[in-house]
């Protein structure tokens, strides 16, 4: 019982400060603290950090309500700590969206979190949506797979989604491969840096996920599916970019009023990027329209105002080439070049 150990009997602001000082002294007794590298990344897990993240997002009017991988900056943490400390237990119970169980442990928990941050001089930390339970599961899986730590958390997340959600005749994996090939081959004209690769991976893996909700205009529904999927190893910006990339499989679907909702996360440069990636993924989809994997590879030649895609096929791919050419006007609009597929 932290209040008892700290010698306080109330939850007044002064009492919270005393708990903070007590925890700091206890932490400083740990030898390991002296050896923590200044470049270490910190992750906050558990109900206290989840509540901190929720309060921080509200206080900053953060546009995206996603818990996992929310970045909590030190000034925002300080602001939330001060507010919670001054409210006390009774008023803290009135905070909207905070469960009663969380409120009961919040004052003590936030004192511990603040003490850790102060002692280690943490400028920013990631909030984990997973708890100790998930950590134990991951540890068990890692031991079984003889892989510590996971080399590609995003890859594992996407594979899990594919296994549990894909239908029997899904061509997601093949469209993903074609999209990655096109992204590399068209680098000269799309001019996108590697910071967009994770967003492309997510969007290409989940390009048709909206079909589970509604087949017609599924690109729009994919937006919400991606935002609400359990994706690890990526930032909120990556997730948002991926969601908008799916929408931009038809660039005309991109609504400016939807985009400006996230102006605290996205930039004008990002808008051009999602349009380009959206068309790349749509082209990959068109090149596997029969779902038979007829197009196995693509080589790109850029000649003046034209882009020539030379397909490597394992059978008759006339249908796929015809479907790909239907994207010509959209390709010209986004990349300012004519498209030819052979």
Please report, for each region that a protein language model flagged, where it lies by residue:
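A short amphipathic beta-strand at an alpha->beta junction
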Residues: 335-342
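Short helix/loop capping segments that flank catalytic or ligand/cofactor-binding pockets
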Residues: 52-53, 291-292, 318-320
């Amino acid at each position: 019982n932290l209040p008892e150990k700290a010698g306080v009997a109330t939850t007044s602001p002064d009492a919270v400060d005393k708990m903070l000082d007590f925890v700091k002294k206890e932490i400083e007794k740990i030898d390991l603290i002296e050896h923590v590298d200044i470049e270490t990344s910190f992750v906050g897990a558990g109900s206290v950090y989840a509540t901190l993240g929720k309060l921080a997002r509200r206080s900053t009017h953060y546009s995206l309500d996603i818990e996992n991988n929310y970045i909590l900056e030190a000034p925002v943490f300080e602001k939330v700590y001060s507010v919670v400390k001054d409210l006390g237990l009774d008023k803290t119970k009135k905070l909207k969206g905070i469960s009663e169980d969380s409120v009961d442990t919040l004052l003590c928990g936030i004192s511990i979190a603040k003490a850790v941050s102060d002692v280690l001089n943490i400028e920013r930390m990631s909030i984990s949506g997973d708890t100790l339970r998930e950590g134990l599961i991951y540890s068990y899986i890692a031991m079984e797979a003889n892989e510590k730590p996971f080399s590609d958390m995003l890859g594992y997340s996407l594979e899990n989604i594919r296994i549990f959600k894909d239908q029997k005749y899904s061509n997601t994996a093949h469209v993903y491969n074609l999209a990655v090939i096109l992204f590399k081959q068209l680098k000269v004209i799309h001019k996108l840096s590697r910071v967009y690769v994770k967003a492309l991976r997510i969007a290409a893996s989940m390009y048709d996920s909206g079909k589970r909700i509604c087949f017609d205009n599924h690109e729009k529904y994919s937006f919400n599916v991606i935002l609400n999927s359990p994706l690890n190893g990526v930032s909120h910006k990556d997730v948002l970019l991926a969601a908008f990339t799916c929408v931009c499989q038809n660039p005309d679907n991109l609504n400016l009023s939807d985009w400006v909702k996230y102006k605290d996360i996205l930039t004008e440069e990002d808008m051009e990027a999602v349009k380009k990636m959206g068309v790349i993924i749509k082209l990959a989809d068109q090149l596997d329209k029969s779902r038979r994997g007829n197009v196995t590879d693509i080589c790109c030649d850029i000649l003046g105002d034209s882009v020539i895609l030379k397909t490597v096929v394992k059978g008759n791919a006339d249908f796929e080439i015809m479907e790909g050419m239907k994207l010509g006007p959209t390709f010209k609009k986004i990349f300012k070049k004519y498209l030819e597929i052979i």
